């Protein structure tokens, strides 16, 4: 199915709203835990430091593997030598932590004052003998999840192009890209092994030294919808072949993801239909609550289309999918599956609104009165005060939502506000009293 065909059936609109989202430097929260021998140095202002301290909620006693290089007036007015200051900090990090890699995270301020991080990093790397990766995960991006996309795209440049002689990879190998908790990554590895496909590596890997081999013989497949920059870098810089598949979110998405990979490797998938059916049967208690209910996505983290497709399959009606940014090429398989799912469930195709204007969205929510709005944190309380059930979209970013077994976690999050309000109604607490 071509993109032109999709455009005829799915309605795409673009508004001129602001990007109401977290700052992308929040990607440090999960990446420093995923890459176990790394150290993340965020180069920014006090505001960035306050944000990380509050958003990550890590006490100083925990000694996390990230820090702030705080820019002061002397830095911004070029009275201090940036190179000397960064060298001092990196030497201190090396002495205290001895990481295998230091990741410099550029912020809005470094972008505005034109700090040449890419120019300084190779010189400093040669001097201190520790790899330094530069990623500009600043707030000028569309969504906060794209911070991870920027870091992984920078990591691609550091992956080896050939395997050591003693560990030659197969002629046709598979590398998956996207940061997942170790247990979820293991589950997806096992699902592919059941189909007879061995995963050659992950980007990012748990250890910097274990970064996967990337060359023209490697097939790559993403596990998150917000990794389009990484996918482009893999294809253009390392000549990898991208497998365009739906994302493994929900039983239907996981099955389609596995089937697409199997088709590329000429492998017949084993018992996938039966396995998906068993998962759906186990979710029936949640689906009963959702069937016939409506949902409205305001747009925040680029997971909206995958989540909407899964909720349509659960029997929900999706009025609108707001999304900060849509790469139609990278998400083409997901869009096709959304269209197919709506057709099979006999429901109307949802509107997809790119860069939505929140003022217009509030009017549409007021008219449509959905049973649930999935929204950023800024809009949750005002909508609740107007009688609309809400769920924070950021929770889906930090929850384990990939693979067959984690579909229950998605439905647990989606149904929680509905179950809470039902419990309050049973108690007779369904009216707000103005004091």
Swiss-Prot record:
SUPFAM superfamilies (alphabetical): Helical backbone' metal receptor
Cofactor(s) in the UniProt record: [4Fe-4S] cluster
CDD domains: Pchlide_reductase_N (cd01979)
Reactions catalysed according to its record: chlorophyllide a + oxidized 2[4Fe-4S]-[ferredoxin] + 2 ADP + 2 phosphate = protochlorophyllide a + reduced 2[4Fe-4S]-[ferredoxin] + 2 ATP + 2 H2O
Keywords per UniProt: 4Fe-4S, ATP-binding, Chlorophyll biosynthesis, Chloroplast, Iron, Iron-sulfur, Metal-binding, Nucleotide-binding, Oxidoreductase, Photosynthesis, Plastid
Entry binding sites for [4Fe-4S] cluster: 23, 48, 108
Highest taxon in the source lineage: Eukaryota
GO molecular function, one term: ATP binding
Coarse class of the protein's main subcellular location: plastid
Cofactor note: Binds 1 [4Fe-4S] cluster per heterodimer. The cluster is bound at the heterodimer interface by residues from both subunits.
EC number: 1.3.7.7
Gene Ontology cellular component annotations, sorted alphabetically: chloroplast
Protein's UniProt keywords contain Chloroplast: yes
EC top class, as a word: oxidoreductase
Places the protein is found: Plastid, Chloroplast
Gene3D superfamilies to which the protein is assigned, alphabetical: Nitrogenase molybdenum iron protein domain
Pathway linked to the protein: Porphyrin-containing compound metabolism; chlorophyll biosynthesis (light-independent)
InterPro entries: LIPOR_BchN/ChlN, Nase/OxRdtase_comp1, Protochl_reductN
Subunit (UniProt): Protochlorophyllide reductase is composed of three subunits; ChlL, ChlN and ChlB. Forms a heterotetramer of two ChlB and two ChlN subunits.
Sequence similarity: Belongs to the BchN/ChlN family.
Physiological role: Component of the dark-operative protochlorophyllide reductase (DPOR) that uses Mg-ATP and reduced ferredoxin to reduce ring D of protochlorophyllide (Pchlide) to form chlorophyllide a (Chlide). This reaction is light-independent. The NB-protein (ChlN-ChlB) is the catalytic component of the complex.
Protein name as annotated: Light-independent protochlorophyllide reductase subunit N
Origin species: Chlorella vulgaris (Green alga)
């Amino acid at each position: 199915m071509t993109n032109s065909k999709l455009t005829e059936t799915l309605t795409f609109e673009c508004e001129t709203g602001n990007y109401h989202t977290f700052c992308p430097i929040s990607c440090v929260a999960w990446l420093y835990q995923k890459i176990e021998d790394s150290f993340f140095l965020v180069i920014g202002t006090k505001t960035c430091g306050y944000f990380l301290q509050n958003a990550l909620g890590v006490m100083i006693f925990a000694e996390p593997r990230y820090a702030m290089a705080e820019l002061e007036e002397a830095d911004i007015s070029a009275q201090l030598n940036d190179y000397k200051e960064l060298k001092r900090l990196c030497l201190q990090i090396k002495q205290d932590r001895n990481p295998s890699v230091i990741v410099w995270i550029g912020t809005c301020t470094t972008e505005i004052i034109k700090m040449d991080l890419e120019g300084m990093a190779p010189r400093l790397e040669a001097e201190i003998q520790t790899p330094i990766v530069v990623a500009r995960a600043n707030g000028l991006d569309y969504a906060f999840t794209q911070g991870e996309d920027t870091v992984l795209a920078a990591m691609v440049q550091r992956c080896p192009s050939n395997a050591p002689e003693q560990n030659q990879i197969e002629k046709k190998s598979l590398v998956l890209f996207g940061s997942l908790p170790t247990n979820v990554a293991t589950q997806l590895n096992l699902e592919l092994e059941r189909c007879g496909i061995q995963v050659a590596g992950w980007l990012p890997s748990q250890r910097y030294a274990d970064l996967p081999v990337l060359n023209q013989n490697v097939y790559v497949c993403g596990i998150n919808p917000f990794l389009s920059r990484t996918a482009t870098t893999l294809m253009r810089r390392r000549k990898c072949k991208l497998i365009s598949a739906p994302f493994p979110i929900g039983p239907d998405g996981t099955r389609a993801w596995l089937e697409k990979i199997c088709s590329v490797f000429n492998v017949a998938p084993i018992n996938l239909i039966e396995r998906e059916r068993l998962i759906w049967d186990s979710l029936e208690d949640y689906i009963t609550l959702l069937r016939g209910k409506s949902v409205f996505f305001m747009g925040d983290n680029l997971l909206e289309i995958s989540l909407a497709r899964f909720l349509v399959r659960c029997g929900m009606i999706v009025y609108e999918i707001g999304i900060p940014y849509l790469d139609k090429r990278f998400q083409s398989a997901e869009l096709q599956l959304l269209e197919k799912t709506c057709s099979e469930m006999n429901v109307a195709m949802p509107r997809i609104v790119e860069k939505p204007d929140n003022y217009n969205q509030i009017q549409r929510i007021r008219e449509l009165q959905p049973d649930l709005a999935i929204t950023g944190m800024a809009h949750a309380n005002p909508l609740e005060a107007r009688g609309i059930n809400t769920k924070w979209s950021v929770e889906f970013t930090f929850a384990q939502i990939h693979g067959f077994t984690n579909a229950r976690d998605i439905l647990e999050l989606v149904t929680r506000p509905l179950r809470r309000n039902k419990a309050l109604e049973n108690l007779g607490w369904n009216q707000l009293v103005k004091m």
